[in-house]
Amino acid sequence: MTPEQELLDGAALTVYRLNGQFLTIGDGLAAPAGISVAWWQVMAAVQQQPLPVAGIARAMGITRQSVQRVADLLVADCICEYRPNPAHKRAKLVAITEAGLAAIERIGPQHAAMAERLAAVLGPAEFAATVATLTRLSAALDTIIDGSDRG
């Protein structure tokens, strides 16, 4: 195996582990608000502005079908609602409701405490550098997936 392959494998395995750790932590944070981490992810995606299901899926890097399933459950529980999309008649917008905002607000104190704990372990500068590195890694993978790295 080449050094580059070893790095790719190491990065992938580390990110898979991180994903599992974040899901475990997220479920623990979300449960007292009566939601799952999957629900919280979709709610967070539309917290600032309504988005179509496809837009949420693109932003999260997951399938449209999985977002659609969660969005339907959120709408059924009145945590989100569908709104008309002026840009596309068939692709409704997912918007968070007051009940959804209240659920996210209930998560806030525990979320803040977890962020403080992680910052205390890593240190603020290393925490920020880690986020920047993960963001660059994601952008590099987007470039490869899009094929724009081939010139």
What is each stretch, according to the model?
Residues 1-33, 125:
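N-terminal leader segment of winged-helix/HTH proteins
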Residues 24-66:
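N-terminal helix-turn-helix DNA-binding core of bacterial DNA-binding proteins
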Residues 44-48, 108, 135:
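Short, locally clustered residues in the helix-turn-helix/winged-helix DNA-binding domain
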Residues 23, 72-132:
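Charged, amphipathic alpha-helical coiled-coil/dimerization segments
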Residues 1-3, 125-151:
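C-terminal regulatory/oligomerization modules of transcriptional regulators
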